[in-house]
From Swiss-Prot:
Transmembrane segments: none
Gene Ontology BP annotations: protein folding
PANTHER family in alphabetical order: CHAPERONIN
Similarity field: Belongs to the TCP-1 chaperonin family.
Keyword Nucleotide-binding attached: yes
Coiled coil: none
Compartment list: Cytoplasm
Protein name: T-complex protein 1 subunit zeta-2
Disulphide bridges, residue numbers: none
Tissue expression notes: Testis-specific.
Length: 530
């Protein structure tokens, strides 16, 4: 009888082989769900929520986030895979596949009586060797635009169809290069992703500036301004109550009138300072003047500004304030006490665009903007969500490539090279731990096998061809998914992120080892005592 039964008679328990079988079954189940997603030829999954909302995706991270997983072990693997996405932005599906395959290969040896601890030791040794191979084969290059296009294309083609991937590749690379500043880490929050529900996904484009999701609030304001000065501010231009609850007593109606005028004058003085600055910088010229305020602007102030030809936008989002100063130059001001020309930014074109009942303000033709906008277009919500998810992954892939300063060949080439190296390395290990190394080598080959299978080719036949070519040519050979034949991944421009593969090896080994070493599963929480 299990020891826990003596303490809690209602506890449920699975021991030794039963516990391992439960865990391996869960890992294999999750693997089977995500298996067909892998690679550019992967298939879509349709997720239907409880409310009947439909989501079409082949992104492993989205799937694992949205799926309701009840099995504790499957849930653990899903969390590890989504954590991989949070850290590196890719590799979710590969993570689940390799963990499932590691457990499957280990199960073959455990069923013959090998202790899980010995396999775990073999896994650890294999991981260290695999990381050495990764270091040897990584390709260090100067990250020029052409290389980054290849990296982005490899990532994006696994998320969306090829035609759309080609369009997104260009805009994603250009957006990261625009916000990249020498000596600073790349901040992807400076790439605003704005969606518009019209046209097609392939109409997605990069705006060298900013797009705000609201327009001016006064009918007489210009809808289009060229060569405009831009004042970015966080100052209230409407009457606000005092912070302290104060009351006033006035003896006559005249005194009340005076009080109202004094309150109004406080706001009018602020507005007048903006008008004076506009007259100073735009005197005798056709230059425009735009005010973008984070706080409110009341109708009287809007009227005064409109009369002087100033375009004013109120209640801009906080996240856009920093982006505005980076895109247009100038400084965001919190007070109008010492307004100068130096506070102003500049944009070549500011115009309002109306789509249905929604209004958008485009701030374009900025000089060397350090913040840009990706304008995502699509005919429906599904397309928009799919394109946005793909863009996020593409941005992360480029950021990783620039920060790593190196890449590794994709198309399953790196996994074939690691497996080959591990089979050779196995012979130098004494004892039964070499079986763990062999299991690890076999498990890594799941990636090229599934890539070939999803493209409609025979996995075994393709893998044998690739391995033979790898041994003969001594180059990193992957699977050409258009022909099913071996190809040199680097020559074809198929690149994966170095940090994704490194993280993959670490997380898969740790989780697979931990799951293997579980010999008892107990459900004995407080709820089971009821």
């Amino acid at each position: 009888m299990a020891a826990i039964k003596a303490v809690n008679s209602k506890a449920e328990v699975a021991r030794a082989r039963a516990a391992l079988a439960v865990n391996i079954c869960a890992a294999r189940g999750l693997q089977d769900v995500l298996r067909t997603n892998l690679g550019p030829k992967g298939t879509m999954k349709m997720l239907v929520s409880g409310a009947g909302d439909i989501k079409l995706t082949k992104d492993g991270n989205v799937l694992l986030d949205e799926m309701q997983i009840q099995h504790p072990t499957a849930s653990l693997i899903a969390k590890v895979a989504t954590a991989q996405d949070d850290v590196t932005g890719d590799g979710t599906t590969s993570n689940v596949l390799i963990i499932g395959e590691l457990l499957k290969q280990a199960d073959l040896y455990i069923s013959e009586g090998l202790h899980p601890r010995i396999i775990a030791e073999g896994f650890e040794a294999a991981k260290i060797k695999a990381l050495e191979v990764l270091e040897e084969v990584k390709v260090t290059k100067e990250m020029k635009r052409k290389i980054l296009l290849d990296v982005a294309r490899t990532s994006l083609q696994t998320k969306v169809h090829a035609e759309l991937a080609d369009v997104l590749t260009e805009v994603v690379v250009d957006s990261v290069l625009a916000v990249r500043r020498p000596g600073y880490p790349i901040d992807l929050f400076m790439v605003e992703i704005m969606e518009m529900k019209h046209k097609l996904g392939t109409d997605t484009k990069l705006i060298q500036g900013l797009v705000l999701d609201h327009g001016a609030r006064h009918p007489d304001m210009k809808k289009r301004v060229e060569d405009a000065f831009i004042l970015i501010c966080n100052v209230s231009l409407e009457y606000e109550k005092t912070e302290v609850n104060s009351g006033f007593f006035y003896k006559t109606a005249e005194e009340k009138e005076k009080l109202v005028k004094a309150e109004r004058k406080f706001i009018e003085d602020r507005v007048q300072k903006i008008i004076d600055l506009k007259d100073k910088v735009c005197a005798q010229s056709n230059k425009g003047f735009v005010v973008i305020n984070q706080k409110g602007i009341d109708p009287f102030s809007l009227d005064s500004l409109a009369k002087h030809g100033i375009v004013a936008l109120r209640r801009a989002k906080r996240r856009n304030m920093e982006r505005l100063s980076l895109a247009c130059g100038g400084m965001a001001v919190n007070s109008f006490e010492d307004l100068t020309v130096d506070c102003l930014g500049h944009a070549g074109l500011v115009y309002e665009y109306t789509l249905g009942e929604e209004k958008f303000t485009f701030i374009e033709e900025c000089v060397n903007p350090c913040s840009v906008t990706l304008l995502v277009k699509g005919p429906n919500k599904h397309t928009l969500t799919q394109v946005k998810d793909a863009i996020r992954d593409g941005l992360r892939a480029i950021k990783n490539a620039i920060e790593d300063g190196c890449m590794v060949p994709g198309a399953g080439a790196i996994e074939v090279a690691m497996a080959e190296a591990l089979v050779t390395y196995k012979n130098s290990i004494k004892g039964r731990a070499r079986l763990g190394v062999q299991a690890f080598a076999d498990a890594l080959l799941i990636i090229p096998k599934v890539l070939a299978q999803n493209a409609g080719y025979d996995p075994q036949e393709t893998l044998v061809k690739v391995q033979a070519e790898h041994v003969e040519s001594k180059q990193l050979v992957g699977v050409d998914l258009n022909t099913g034949e071996p190809m040199v991944a680097a020559d074809a421009g198929v690149w994966d992120n170095y940090c994704v593969k490194k993280q993959l090896l670490h997380s898969c080994t740790v989780i697979a080892t931990n799951i293997l070493l579980v010999d008892e599963i107990m459900r004995a929480g407080m709820s089971s005592l009821k």
